[in-house]
């Protein structure tokens, strides 16, 4: 069993109170388990369940909160870094919310190769914005002159808004984050046309 300091999972006071109320009705020493199903994929789903004392594994990591602990299995662990659990009450009722920005893709180190850090930002920040249009972006390569070559898929493919979205939105966002390592972004079709412009 490990105590983990480098991975951070935030549980709000309201959510902790909610968990304590639920755990009072369970057998003694029951805690909670936080997990990710299909971690590292676009279909990743996070969940919370009861964790009876006999269900704790040697390889679990324990996070201690006020009045209970949360256990995380070793596979889910890196994908739950920076996760936030809250208990929200509104006129429609109360519900538990779980945000895990790294569930679909493991966080990369600050000193990782530029292409990995860039891909991480595209997967965790750019694609969720495009998902509402049914689109997504894939990083194909970074050229020697520091251009990121992107391929649009789904609802973005062949969409007349691609140029506007690409130039104004995504390029601006990525250049702000990587001012020294990136010169701009290009759509893969534009990049290929440029390479074969003598046809």
UniProtKB/Swiss-Prot annotation:
Keywords: 4Fe-4S, Iron, Iron-sulfur, Metal-binding. [4Fe-4S] cluster binds at residues 156, 159. Coiled coil: none annotated. SUPFAM superfamilies: Fe-S cluster assembly (FSCA) domain-like, HesB-like domain. GO terms for biological process: iron-sulfur cluster assembly; protein maturation. Pfam families: Fe-S_biosyn, NifU. GO terms for molecular function: 4 iron, 4 sulfur cluster binding; iron ion binding. The keyword 4Fe-4S applies. Its cofactor is [4Fe-4S] cluster. InterPro entries: Fe/S_biogenesis_protein_NfuA, FeS_biogenesis, FSCA_dom_sf, HesB-like_dom_sf, NIF_FeS_clus_asmbl_NifU_C. Binds 1 [4Fe-4S] cluster per subunit. The cluster is presumably bound at the interface of two monomers. Homodimer. PANTHER family: FE_S BIOGENESIS PROTEIN NFUA, IRON-SULFUR CLUSTER SCAFFOLD PROTEIN NFU-RELATED. Involved in iron-sulfur cluster biogenesis. Binds a 4Fe-4S cluster, can transfer this cluster to apoproteins, and thereby intervenes in the maturation of Fe/S proteins. Could also act as a scaffold/chaperone for damaged Fe/S proteins. Belongs to the NfuA family. This is Fe/S biogenesis protein NfuA. It comes from Actinobacillus pleuropneumoniae serotype 5b (strain L20).
């Amino acid at each position: 069993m490990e105590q983990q300091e480098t991975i951070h999972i935030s549980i709000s006071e309201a959510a902790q109170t909610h968990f304590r109320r639920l755990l009072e009705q369970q057998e003694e020493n029951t805690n909670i388990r936080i997990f990710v199903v299909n971690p590292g994929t676009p279909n990743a789903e996070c969940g919370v369940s009861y964790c009876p004392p006999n269900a704790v594994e040697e390889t679990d990591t324990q996070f201690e909160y006020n009045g209970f602990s949360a256990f995380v299995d070793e596979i889910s662990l890196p994908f739950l870094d920076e996760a936030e659990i809250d208990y929200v009450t509104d006129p429609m009722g109360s519900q538990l919310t779980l945000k895990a920005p790294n569930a679909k893709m493991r966080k990369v180190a600050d000193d990782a190769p530029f292409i990995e850090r860039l891909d991480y930002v595209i997967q965790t920040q750019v694609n969720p914005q495009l998902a509402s249009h049914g689109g997504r972006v894939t990083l194909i390569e970074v050229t020697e002159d520091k251009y990121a070559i992107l391929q649009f898929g789904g609802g973005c493919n062949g969409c007349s808004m691609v140029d506007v979205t690409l130039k104004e939105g995504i390029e601006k966002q990525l250049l702000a984050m990587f001012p020294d390592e990136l010169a701009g972004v290009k759509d893969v079709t534009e990049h290929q046309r440029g390479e074969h412009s003598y046809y």
